[in-house]
């Protein structure tokens, strides 16, 4: 799925979870969360010497349901401690941030699974790519 769609969906998740507490900043944090799984493109290029292995790494573990669960705690905890300082102290809870990152990260691989390329939703337990193949993707 294209990055714009993932950013907008992540922003919508951020607004739904924290919009009333932190306003438009929730859109930004949700958009960041919505793009986190696609950082595997850069990680794959760093880890592997050739482009084929790097592309095979894409839509792997960082697009799995397990990563959504683990990642939401990591990014939620980190953001909670960085955001809740000074005047903003006490405006949000750790649970708010974990939920924001869970929904923004979780929706990313679900949306990607509707494309013909598929997504390894069950990685690292299975390398099967779930692909519903009902949204066409036009890659430039």
Model-based region annotation:
Residues 1-140:
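N-terminal membrane-targeting hydrophobic helices
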């Amino acid at each position: 799925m294209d990055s714009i769609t993932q950013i907008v969906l992540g922003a919508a998740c951020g607004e739904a979870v924290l919009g009333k507490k932190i306003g438009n900043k929730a859109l930004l944090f949700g958009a960041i969360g919505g793009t986190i799984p696609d950082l595997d493109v850069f990680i794959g290029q760093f880890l592997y010497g050739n482009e084929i292995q790097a592309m095979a790494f894409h839509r792997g573990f960082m697009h799995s349901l397990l990563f959504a669960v683990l990642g939401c705690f990591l990014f939620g905890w980190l953001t909670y401690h960085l955001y809740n300082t000074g005047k903003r102290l006490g405006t949000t809870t750790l649970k708010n941030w974990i939920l924001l990152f869970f929904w923004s990260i979780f929706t990313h691989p679900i949306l990607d699974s509707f494309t013909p390329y598929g997504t390894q939703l069950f990685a690292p337990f299975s390398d099967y790519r779930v692909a519903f193949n009902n949204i066409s993707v036009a890659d430039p």
